[in-house]
Amino acid sequence: MADNQYYGTGRRKSSSARVFIKPGSGNIVINKRSLEVYFGRETARMVVRQPLELVDMLGKLDLYITVKGGGISGQAGAIRHGITRALMEYDETLRSDLRKAGFVTRDARSVERKKVGLRKARRRPQFSKR
């Protein structure tokens, strides 16, 4: 593809996102759809825009994103992580600001597995004394 393109991979829960950044007018395309069409919820859109707003690049970069797996919140988090990594590849001086905001660290929280003998991960069956 283009020479002046920067790449970042982001993950969150069971979602993974591939983010390509290049200088442009501020278009954000996710799985061949616009940000507004892909994410119906405003909170998810805010999460995606967070790293760009932090470094004042909202209207200066075009983003092409493919994301797979998980739900809305996980995908939004994965995209945010991917954008952060791509921005660091684009300009290493942004790393400290992004680190302070907490976008660089991968959120390792995921669903706890269901255990044998329990109803859910921690929910026990009802106990009857008599």
From Swiss-Prot:
**Which intervals of the chain are annotated as region Disordered?**
110-130
Q: Which UniProt keywords apply?
A: Ribonucleoprotein, Ribosomal protein
Q: Where is the composition biased (Basic residues)?
A: 116-130
A GO CC term? cytosolic small ribosomal subunit
Q: Which GO terms describe its biological process?
A: translation
Q: Which domain of life is it from?
A: Bacteria
Q: Which GO terms describe its molecular function?
A: RNA binding; structural constituent of ribosome
Pfam families tied to this protein: Ribosomal_S9 (PF00380)
NCBIfam families recorded for this chain?
PRK00132.1
Q: Which family does it belong to?
A: Belongs to the universal ribosomal protein uS9 family.
Q: What is this protein called?
A: Small ribosomal subunit protein uS9
Source organism: Proteus mirabilis (strain HI4320)
State the gene name recorded for this protein.
Answer: rpsI
